[in-house]
A protein has these predicted regions:
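Conserved class I S-adenosyl-L-methionine
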Residues: 4, 10-63, 66-73, 78, 82
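A short SAM/SAH-binding and catalytic strip from SAM-dependent methyltransferases
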Residues: 133-147
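Conserved beta-strand signature within the Rossmann-like core of class I S-adenosyl-L-methionine
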Residues: 163-170
Length: 171
């Protein structure tokens, strides 16, 4: 467990109550990932690896050759890299500076991933009905109010093709 937490200002515990008090969404998300090491989250234990592998196996049931995937809240790119290396066209959107840096560090010229730093509430850079598969595994955890959650889901629906699939993760 300790590998996926970074030490910040001498503490190794995330203070969720303090983070929750930050009203500005971008600041709250950035502060969270300054502390939390998203780059190793899905690999830090056997249980985490099972979560990742179970998720991708389920998604693969719905993929067809040539599908375009949008990974909203892509983190450090675990799902984006997996699907891009399987030959799918992947676009990744991520808000947190730390995750963008970790993602870019792993990105090679062979990786066909369009990585953009941006907010899940604003997918205006993407045309309507432009993706076969939309992954929404992170942003809903961070959005505090129902209106923002609904906007995020509406944007995901807007960019998903008719007959496409949207995969959500939310607690």
């Amino acid at each position: 467990g300790a590998r996926w937490k970074k030490k910040v200002r001498g503490t190794d515990d995330m203070d969720f109550e303090q983070l929750a008090k930050i009203e500005n969404e971008s600041e709250r998300v950035n502060r969270t990932y300054d502390i939390f090491n998203e780059d190793v989250r899905l690999n830090h234990s056997k249980a985490a690896r099972v979560e990742f592998l179970t998720t991708v196996r389920y998604i693969e049931k719905y993929l067809k050759e040539g599908d375009k995937i949008l990974d909203i809240g892509a983190g450090a790119g675990e799902y984006s890299f997996y699907f891009a290396r399987k030959g799918y066209e992947v676009s990744a959107l991520e808000l947190a500076d730390a995750n963008i840096a970790a993602f870019r560090k792993k990105l090679t010229t062979e990786d066909k991933i369009d990585l953009v730093q941006g907010n899940a509430l604003d997918l205006s850079r993407y045309a309507d009905k432009s993706f076969d598969i939309v992954l929404l595994f992170g942003p809903l955890y961070h959005l505090k109010n129902d209106a923002d959650k609904q906007k995020c889901i509406s944007e995901a629906k807007r960019v998903c093709k008719d007959g496409g699939k949207i995969f959500f993760a939310f607690i």
